[in-house]
Amino acid sequence: MDKQMVEVLNNIHFAERYQALRTQYSFDSKESFATYDNSYVLAMLREIGYASVKYWRKENFFQARKKSNIYEFRYHMCIKYGIAELMWYAMKNNKYYAGGSFPNLEYDLLNPENRNHLPNFRNYEDLRGILTIAFQMCEDMTAQFLKVYGDVT
């Protein structure tokens, strides 16, 4: 991770926010909500504010895209077995430029001794909470990324 990406994440207090998200949505795996309706989740994502969102059946994840002048940002949400794996990517010329899964970004920032668990959910209400917080974090990362890296054509 380069210094600019560290600056992006530190400026939005990424590690603290992700830790708070994981703590708030930490339940016994026996309570997890493994069966959900993809079309319901798509509608929920649109209500939250995710734009250009679609479900990729083959890879089994949801993706939202946001474009700027020279970058495209991709917000991925893989929700299986009641667990939410969240990802944020910046693409340039259709190639990976920066980003990663939230746990990997946290690890690169803090290098914790042990890997932490992913947020999990028991119902649609929990899932909405996770996706709402994740959306704001992704939007903040995108805005801060554009400030730090610039968006000149």
Feature names for model-found ranges:
Residues 1-40, 56-57, 62-76, 81-153:
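Intrinsically disordered, low-complexity regulatory regions enriched in serine/threonine/proline
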